[in-house]
């Protein structure tokens, strides 16, 4: 839910920037899609919002979100003996939506195209540990997403669903969120 909410926020920001002529574009094209690929075991949240630069990914994902999420998740896992109860308690908690993705995913990729001119598309990858990889998005990464080339702004968050999150590969479970 939090990931979809973040995607909606990004599209709303893009619409607002278009309305005040800060950027060019069509505000009607700012959409969010949830793409389930059971065969590849991925769940992608795709938005046509403002996107993020490498600097913004570092700030919002690596610094702000990660620092608060680690301590919070540890406290919740100590409190709940049952792992599934811990997951339910954490998911949806304000500010932890992004890192709650690791409770169902073995790996998360962020691929983002900033709306700001001169910013290279960025790819961030993490397996839930404190270690991550971040750098320019390759042409192969872009092609693999199957994104429309006219839509060179926004963010794809790709969850590579693990065994514990298998229920999130079912249409009904996704529709319930």
Task: Name what the model sees in each region.
Residues 1-163, 168:
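GHKL (Bergerat-fold) ATPase N-terminal catalytic module, capturing the glycine-rich phosphate-binding loop
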Residues 173:
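Short, flexible catalytic-loop segment of classical short-chain dehydrogenase/reductase
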């Amino acid at each position: 839910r939090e990931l979809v909410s973040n995607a909606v926020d990004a599209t709303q920001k893009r619409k607002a920037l278009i309305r005040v002529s800060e950027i060019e574009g069509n505000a009607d094209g700012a959409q969010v899609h949830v793409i389930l690929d059971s065969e590849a075991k991925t769940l992608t949240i795709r938005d046509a919002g403002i996107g993020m630069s490498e600097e913004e990914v570092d700030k919002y994902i690596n610094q702000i979100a990660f620092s608060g999420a680690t301590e919070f998740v540890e406290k919740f896992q100590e409190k709940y003996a049952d792992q599934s109860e811990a997951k339910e308690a954490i998911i949806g908690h304000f500010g932890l939506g992004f890192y709650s993705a690791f409770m169902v995913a073995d790996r998360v990729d962020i691929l983002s195209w900033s709306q700001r001119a001169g910013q290279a598309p960025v790819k961030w990858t993490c397996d839930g540990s404190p270690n991550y990889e971040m750098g320019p998005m390759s042409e192969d990464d872009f092609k693999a997403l199957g994104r429309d080339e006219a839509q060179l702004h926004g963010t794809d968050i790709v969850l590579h669903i693990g065994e514990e999150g298998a229920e999130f590969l079912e249409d009904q479970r996704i529709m319930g969120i």
